[in-house]
Amino acid sequence: MQSMEALMPRDSHLETLQTVLDGLMRRYQARVPDVARVLQAMTAAGLIGHAGAVENDHIAFRTMGVPHLGIASLERIFLHYGYTRHDRYNFATKKLTAYWYRPPQVHFPRIFISELRVPELSPQAQSIITSYTDEVQQDPVDDLDLDDGHAVDAFLHQPLWRTPTWDDYQTLLRESEFAAWVIYNRYYLNHFTVTVHNLPAPYNTIASFNEFLVAHGFTLNDAGGTIKVSADGNLIQSSLVAQMVPATFADGHGGTIEQRIAGSYIEFAERRVLPDFRDLPPDQLGREHRRDGFDAGNADGIFESTYTHQTRKQEV
């Protein structure tokens, strides 16, 4: 006998997924003013007809590798909607592990989830992190109705642990800027990605689109170069420096303190046509004909969009 899961219409999962993605993007755009500015510039230049016409290559989340959380927990949400996991990436210096997830249909974005390998940090950093994450006593996805898109959206934006203190945030920042970002932002969407290769020429390459961004006053992340190219040359990426956002921390004495920290950012991706399909007419090219997946070298630099040595450039 088939399970209720197997009998559930596929469309219901996809509708729920769309609700979740819409919720993520709505809150992300409200917190990242650069999104509206970029989309307005693209619309004014005729690159897209309207803001909703932009093609989202992928979205990304950051997680802590601790019991009940991390990739093993968060991925369950998207696997439920038909995403499939691919390719493990290791970032030795940053102490990160990541996977990417292929969507159930090509109009949905890919997903990239990274996880901090907490046991590799110093005892002090581990102690700070677990003092918060130990408040999570079981996998929170266990109690989540994955068929309720609004509930999933709310979960992805709710606190998983108490508000961190400013002192703890600063201590983590000195050792792992990734850790500091996650201890405050939790599952908040880290970035979304504009698909560049389907834009009108000449703006359909990262090189030309970066020039467009700079001309409109945006600050590019130059960690690893402003243009990041995969080892095979077929995935070209860039990103903006994360904007600084207001954040409320605990002051350690029962009150709160307001600070400005790195928020989320925007990425841009150009996926070149694979050699076997380069004779296809442009109007016949689909996602399946282009370079898929990710590149560890590119991603290593893009992570630093939220790092202090990048964000301080906006203050100059």
Tell what function each PLM region has.
Residues 3-75, 80-316:
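Extended, well-ordered protein cores
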